[in-house]
A protein has these predicted regions:
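Acidic, glycine-rich active-site loops and adjacent beta-strand->loop/helix elements
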Residues: 48-60, 80-83, 209, 239
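A common structural junction motif
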Residues: 174-180, 272
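Zn-dependent metallopeptidase/amidohydrolase metal-coordination segment
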Residues: 206-207, 211-275
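Active-site-adjacent substrate-binding region
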Residues: 116-131, 139-140, 179, 188-236
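Midchain, well-structured core segments that form catalytic/ion-binding scaffolds
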Residues: 56-170
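Buried hydrophobic packing segments
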Residues: 27-37, 66, 229, 265-269
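Active-site metal-coordination/substrate-binding segment of hydrolases
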Residues: 1-47, 52, 248-251, 255-260
Length: 278
């Protein structure tokens, strides 16, 4: 296992480091893309900004503050997902079931019956929803929490756009026994862009031109800054077949992919800033 905080490059040009894929490497690809545009003397009709977020994993507080003091961008992307361009993200919600310690028997029964024995798709709660664009509902991040004299259990949903979060909440409440409470700790509604609109079609065409691969827009089970920042779609950096790399030991990204990302992003910047998609 390579040290996470000191990049190591092997003889094949593969770089190992925490964040090389998610997202420090792709951020540098965006910077080099903008630098290349400047060095080539390409004129842009619109200004370009790169925002460095630091709170994407724990609540988006950075962008919430940004949006209080600045206007959102006209359009853009976050390099925090995969290729081709992602036109829709699932919703994300986290729930907490709680009760007094003396109700631990009822609490344990609920957790065992509806959460721990679930197949990961919400079937025990009657939430095994599926649609053609997003696929199946997913349940994850199950954990016991200490609430200072009360029992608590958190669990999260990654849900398709065909179900609303208030429907999820009503369904959970219908399963509760006396003495149990449930609350939605946070929710981020699904993100949905017109896959035939200018932004998605421009990024689709750019990806296809640079890579020669199919750029048909896709959906994702993940969540990115697109949840909170208007007019932003997930776009890169992972290429088809590259899965389960980020947040794991030996996170990696090939030097050639960093360069390829920079090429994709450079052409994308020029086309979006100048209102071109061809």
């Amino acid at each position: 296992i390579h040290p996470p905080f000191s990049a190591y490059e092997d003889e094949n040009g593969r770089i190992f480091a925490r964040g090389i894929l998610d997202n420090k490497g792709p951020t540098l690809s965006c910077l080099y893309a903008l630098y290349a545009i400047k060095k080539l003397g390409i004129q842009l009709k619109r200004p370009v900004h790169i925002l460095f977020g630091t709170n994407e994993e724990t609540g988006f507080e950075d962008l919430k503050h940004f949006l209080k003091v600045r206007k959102p961008p006209i359009m853009g992307w976050t390099p925090d997902c995969k290729y081709p361009v992602v036109y829709a993200e699932r919703g994300r919600s986290t729930y907490r079931v709680s009760t007094a310690i003396e109700n631990k028997t009822v609490f344990n029964q609920f957790i065992n019956e509806y959460i721990l024995s679930d197949n990961g798709f919400g079937n025990k709660l009657g939430l095994n929803i599926e649609d053609l664009e997003f696929g199946k509902m997913q349940m994850s991040n199950k954990k016991l929490v200490d609430l200072e004299g009360k029992l608590g259990f958190d669990f999260s949903f990654s849900y398709p756009a065909s179900i609303r979060n208030d429907t999820i909440e009503r369904t959970i409440k219908s399963k509760l026994s006396k003495g149990l409470q449930v609350e939605c700790i946070h929710n981020y509604d699904p993100v949905y862009f017109d896959k035939n609109g200018f932004l998605c079609q421009t990024l689709k065409a750019t990806y296809e031109k640079v890579t020669g691969m199919d750029g048909t827009p896709v959906t994702t089970t993940g969540g990115t800054y697109a949840k909170i920042m208007p007019n932003i779609v997930p776009f890169g950096p992972s290429f088809p077949g590259q899965k389960g790399i980020g947040h794991n030991p030996n996170e990696w990204m090939d030097r050639s992919d960093l360069i390829l990302n920079a090429k994709i992003y450079a052409l994308s910047i020029v086309r979006l800033a100048n209102g071109e998609n061809d």
